[in-house]
């Protein structure tokens, strides 16, 4: 697929560009309530932490305003259709870390609310506990750990088994994701953003091995990209066994 024929999901944003560290930048902004009303013809999108005024219509929880953020320099189109992304297919090694069961729910937003979007390809990638991405440089070239995609089912869900990400200087703990339509009349549509983590949970995770050997991390408040919409991209986490389960719902205007 060439850049010239890529069409982006509007994802209820307006466009602008702002350069960030590590070649990351935010590619959109969160709509105001007035703008969301205009887009949806009276349907209100609920963003995290925002309550509607009394008497104002509400949409299902899956209808949220999702700011777009650039994929950064570490995306590779590996086309690895797998749910468990912890291993590297080149040598079968498995990345150590606190388990994370990740569910992304993709919905198409219309004038009457949200409908689960089936058949969307959802890519996920992130760094390991040491803050290193696969297939980025040096001894990770050709590696594919902590990368993969799933195709959403009838309920719009894509599920992954992974680990809690580490961090690297200048960036808070985060996960990258990309939603793509690779078949059908909407072929070429895509939407890219990032997910962030609650600081208290991250503090507990990073106190455990193999994360604990590292120094002081970059916190959400010190991440310039997080400050531009990251509060609306927080992964909802619950404890699950020795790790966590996380969910995030993505409302896209296709």
Residue positions per predicted region:
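Low-complexity, intrinsically disordered Gly/Pro/Thr-rich segments
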Residues: 226-238
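Beta-strand-dominated extracellular/periplasmic modules and repeats
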Residues: 59-228, 247, 251-254
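N-terminal secretory signal peptides
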Residues: 1-31, 42-48
């Amino acid at each position: 697929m060439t850049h010239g024929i890529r069409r982006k999901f509007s994802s209820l944003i307006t466009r602008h560009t702002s350069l960030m560290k590590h070649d990351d930048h935010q590619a959109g902004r969160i709509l105001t309530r007035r703008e969301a009303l205009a887009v949806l013809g009276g349907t209100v999108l609920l963003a995290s932490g925002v309550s509607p005024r009394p008497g104002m219509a509400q949409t299902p929880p899956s209808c949220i305003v999702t700011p777009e953020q650039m994929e950064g320099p570490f995306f590779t189109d590996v086309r690895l259709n797998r749910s468990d992304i912890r291993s590297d297919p080149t040598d079968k090694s498995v990345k150590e870390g606190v388990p994370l069961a990740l569910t992304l729910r993709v919905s198409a937003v219309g004038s009457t609310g949200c409908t689960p979007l089936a058949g969307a390809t959802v890519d996920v990638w992130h760094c390991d506990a040491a803050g290193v991405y696969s297939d980025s440089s040096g001894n990770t070239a050709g590696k594919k750990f902590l990368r993969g995609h799933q195709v959403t089912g009838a309920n719009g869900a894509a599920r992954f088994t992974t680990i809690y990400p580490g961090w690297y200087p200048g960036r808070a703990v985060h996960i990258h994701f990309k939603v793509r339509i690779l078949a059908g009349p909407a072929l070429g549509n895509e939407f890219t953003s990032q997910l962030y983590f609650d600081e208290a949970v991250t503090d507990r995770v990073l106190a455990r091995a193999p994360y604990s050997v590292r120094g002081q991390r970059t916190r959400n408040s010190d991440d310039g990209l997080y400050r531009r919409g990251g509060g609306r991209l927080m992964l909802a986490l619950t404890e699950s066994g020795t790790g966590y389960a996380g969910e995030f719902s993505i409302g896209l205007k296709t």
